UniProtKB/Swiss-Prot annotation:
Residues 818-840 have a biased composition (Basic and acidic residues). GO terms for cellular component: cell envelope Sec protein transport complex; cytosol; plasma membrane. It comes from the Bacteria. The gene is secA. Zn(2+) binds at C846, C848, C857, C858. Keywords: ATP-binding, Cell inner membrane, Cell membrane, Cytoplasm, Membrane, Metal-binding, Nucleotide-binding, Protein transport, Translocase, Translocation, Transport, Zinc. It comes from Campylobacter curvus (strain 525.92). This is Protein translocase subunit SecA. The keyword Membrane applies. GO terms for molecular function: ATP binding; metal ion binding; protein-exporting ATPase activity. Its cofactor is Zn(2+).
């Protein structure tokens, strides 16, 4: 009550923020006549003068903001024939301050972005503008590029499929770079797999504006960016697990309100949390079918994992809802955009389980070579901002995860769209009949209708019903996306009927003419509520742009997934009380609120899932940053490795003494020097005379052995120029580092897969994950030190000319393996396509130059079996 009175007197927090911006907008407006009076050359000169002062540090961005915004507005009037509205100036200031600007559909977000983009590009440190697809990135870079070029700023775009380093470098070196979230993220990962600093394409992460920020930072947050390579694991387990899963019977969960109630059947599905629980009866049955005594023994861990994924594939994932089968492949359907996610695969074996279910070719599992999340990638920028039409529903998450405020920007013209209360029916059949009747009424009077569906399957059901009703219409879904722009552009024509999945929620504006305005504008019909209120709001937002009339209404049924799983009991009770007959519906604000509460429940669950993912990735992210920082040091031509090599050599010798059971304080007569010398020879090919070490104390052996190895190494390297020596050391160190990091990521994957089971032992899985991942990282560092010393000691040099050729060839081979042998894949919190790497024949000379066969040298120290496997 008190807060309501406070808001009435002082306005909301958003209102108070807007008032501050309005004062500044008034001042910017006073500058308009000054810049209008200038000719083109004078306007450019005024901008360049401001730009020079910013670059020299004489003026800060805040000090030049008013003039720069006024200049950009004037330049836009001349070049683009568009003048920034006052509310667009407010949006520009919000973005410049590193906040999220929530702007309704049709309010010109693309034009708004030009203001902070130009302002921040003046520093010369680069500005990135992120869009949801290549088409929008190219379109915006081309259209807005005319304005940027007029002001002397360079603009470029990074597109998928164009991976030439020189092309990418040119794009990132431009003042302004457009591209998609996945391309920016993958370029970051690719850069940290390069063997020469000059091949890196990205520069510092200065300022980024994310268009459709809710889609990228919220919806895509559960999608890790992963570069992956092949594994040698067999695929037979997926087929067997699929056969077993189909023989198990689905049951009901135990009723918490009934004492001693037990779950029935072989397994229980929790649709709310999207999990499967196998009952005792199910475990016994599965063990018989697999022919094992204990399904949950360590040696059967892979079997139980395959079975879990097979049960998920059959009971939680629907064809034409969560995925489609296209060209004999399982392709994911993005639940938020409705588009096909080509090249993306579910991980942890789920995609293979779906392939087994659909009887298509099962592709190999993959191993992580490099990964990050969008949360951690975008948090690297010094300043992050975003814009979207729908952000307030996720304001808490933006604040907690990204430290971003959401500011709702007033519309330039009041919204005239009428949003009607939901209509709720008992069954889906009744609901769809009512939808068809409503479409028919609107079509007969000429009012265009856009019908939103939550899945491909539902869009095709409606399509068949409209065909029977003889109502002409267009269908837009992931199976028919090629004509998307044309279908959406025509959706506002008189009498048009368009059925669309969530694809219609963003991107292209639907324009209407005066005749359609007189008929009430575009009519939006939603056939069910999405789990996220934002997706519903995006659908509604297709109507009523820039003050146009329009109308929206959602038709629901108690059989819809959202109501069935999360909230129908209360609504069903109301319908029963009111005695609703077949074909009748409820329309009340109370029911609409109940539906929104169900959506809030789901949003809360998803938020917790994303937060959970981030908590785990934050652990890995600290390790990732440490490794990448060290990698950058190695790539620095001025970095001298001599001290690091000497330190590692001493630690390596101490490790060898431990392995030979030569301990500090032991009796020197008991030391097995012969065994120690054999270990050294097997490890790094160095022959040590036993007599040099016999009769010495522990400290003396440590010092003597370190001295011998150092002396031999220095003698070997003395024939090289200092720069050659440094290059060889760095190349070998990078090779060891990348192999060790790759193996570490594999072990981290295994750890993450099984860590949830610790909860059954009354232990917090996250705390356990932090402890064990730290131990794995300590092992990684130790392995890195010892393996690097081994590699350096094993190097056998030829003549200087031969060595130069060998070093150059080796660098080229290593980079080829990264560039050609890898595929860059996103995977959805869950596997990426199998990747082919160039393989060195086992009996070929080792590329490190040791003179040994590959199988006896680096091939022997390749990825080992994970410690938790």
């Amino acid at each position: 009550m008190v807060s309501a009175i406070f808001r009435k007197i002082f306005g909301t927090k958003n209102d108070r923020e807007i008032k501050k911006y309005v004062k500044r907008v008034k001042f910017i407006n006073t500058l308009e006549p000054k810049y209008e009076a200038m000719n083109d050359e004078e306007l450019k000169a005024a901008f360049n003068e401001l730009r020079a002062k910013v670059k020299e540090g004489v003026l800060g961005l805040e000090e030049v903001l008013n003039d720069v915004f006024a200049v950009v507005r004037e330049a836009s009037k001349r070049v683009l024939k568009m003048r920034h509205f006052d509310v667009q100036l407010i949006g520009g200031m919000v973005l410049h301050e590193g906040r999220i600007a929530e702007m309704k559909t049709g309010e010109g977000k693309t034009l708004v972005a030009t203001l902070p983009v130009v302002l921040n590009a003046m520093s010369g440190k680069g500005v990135h503008v992120v869009t949801v697809n290549d088409y929008l990135a190219k379109r915006d870079a081309t259209q807005m590029g005319e304005l940027y070029n007029f002001l002397g700023l360079s603009v470029d775009v990074v597109l998928s499929g164009v991976y030439d380093d020189s092309v990418r470098q040119a794009a990132y070196n431009a003042d302004i770079t457009y591209g998609t979230n996945s391309e920016f993220g993958f370029d970051y990962l690719r850069d940290n797999m390069k063997f020469d600093a000059k091949d890196k394409v990205q520069r510092e992460h200065n300022f980024v504006i994310v268009d459709e920020v809710d889609s990228i930072l919220i919806d895509e947050a559960r999608t890790p960016l992963i570069i992956s390579g092949p594994t040698n694991r067999t695929l037979d387990g997926y087929i067997k697990a699929d056969e077993v899963a189909q023989k198990l019977t689905r049951g009901e969960a135990a009723d918490p309100n009934v004492p001693n109630s037990k779950a029935t059947g072989d397994f229980v599905v929790d649709e709310k949390n999207r999990t499967i629980m196998i009952t005792e009866a199910g475990i016994s049955k599965a063990e018989k079918l697999f022919g094992v005594e204990n399904l949950y023994n360590l040696e059967n861990a892979i079997l139980s994992h395959h079975l879990d994924q097979a049960l998920k594939a059959h009971n939680l994932f629907e064809r034409d809802v969560h995925y489609v089968v296209k060209n004999n492949e399982v392709v994911i359907v993005d639940e938020f955009t409705g588009r096909l996610s080509e090249g993306r695969r579910f991980s942890e074996g789920l995609h293979q389980a779906l392939e087994a279910k659909e009887k298509v070719k099962i592709q190999e599992e993959s191993q992580t070579l490099a990964d990050t999340t969008y949360q951690n990638y975008f948090r690297m920028y010094k300043k992050l901002a975003g814009m979207t039409g729908t952000a307030q529903t996720e304001a808490t998450e933006f604040s907690q995860i990204y430290k971003l405020d959401v500011i709702s920007i007033p519309t330039n013209v009041p919204v005239m769209r009428i949003d009607k209360n939901d209509l709720i029916y008992k069954t889906q059949a009744e609901k769809f009949k009512a939808v068809i009747d409503e479409i028919k009424r609107s079509h007969e009077k000429g009012q265009p209708v856009l019908v939103g569906t939550a899945s491909i399957e539902r869009s095709e059901v409606l399509h068949e019903m409209l065909v029977k009703a003889k109502i002409p219409h267009s269908v837009l879904n992931a199976k028919n996306h090629e004509k998307e722009a044309q279908i959406i552009a025509d959706a506002g024509a008189k009498g048009a009927v368009t059925i669309a999945t969530n694809m219609a929620g963003r991107g292209v504006d639907i324009r209407i003419d005066d005749e359609v305005r007189a008929l009430g504008g575009l009519y939006i019909i939603g056939t069910e509520r999405h789990e996220s209120r934002r997706i519903d709001n995006q659908l509604r937002g297709r109507a009523g742009r820039q003050g146009d009339p329009g109308m929206s209404r959602f038709y629901l049924s108690l059989e819809d997934n959202l109501l069935r799983i999360f909230g129908s009991d209360r609504i069903k009770a109301i319908m029963d009380r009111l005695g609703i007959d077949e074909g009748e519906s409820i329309e009340s604000r109370m029911v609409t609120r109940a539906v929104e509460n169900a959506q809030k429940k789901v949003e809360s669950l998803h938020f917790e899932a994303r937060k959970h993912l981030l908590e785990y990735d934050d652990v890995a992210n600290e390790q990732r940053k440490t490794i990448y920082k060290y990698r950058d040091e190695l790539l620095d031509k001025e970095y001298d490795m001599s001290e690091k090599i000497a330190q590692n050599r001493g630690e390596y010798v101490a490790l060898l003494l431990d392995q030979a059971e030569i301990f500090h304080g032991g009796l020197k007569d008991d030391y097995d020097i012969k065994n120690l010398c054999a270990l050294i020879f097997n490890d790094c090919g160095e022959e040590i005379n036993e007599s040099e070490l016999k009769g010495l104390e522990y400290d003396e052996i440590l010092a003597k052995l370190t001295e011998i190895l150092a002396k031999r190494y220095d003698e070997k390297m003395s024939v090289l120029e200092p720069t050659q020596k440094r290059d060889i050391e760095k190349v070998l160190y990078l090779q060891v580092l990348d192999n060790a990091w790759r193996e570490h990521l594999y072990q981290m994957d295994i750890l993450k897969t099984g860590i949830g089971l610790r909860g059954y032992n009354q232990k917090d899985p996250l705390i356990e994950y932090k402890k064990e991942s730290y131990n794995l990282f300590v092992e990684l560092v130790s392995r890195l030190k010892s393996e690097s010393v081994k590699m350096l000691q094993m190097v056998r040099l030829r003549s200087r000319e031969e060595q130069e050729r060998e070093t150059a060839a080796m660098l080229e081979r290593m980079q080829e393996q990264q560039d050609e042998g890898l595929k860059f894949n996103q995977r959805e919190g869950e596997d990426a396509p199998a990747v082919r790497e160039k393989k060195i024949p086992r009996n070929s000379p080792c590329p490190c130059g040791s003179g040994k066969k590959y199988k006896d040298c680096c091939g022997k120290s390749g990825p080992k079996k994970g410690i938790l496997a």
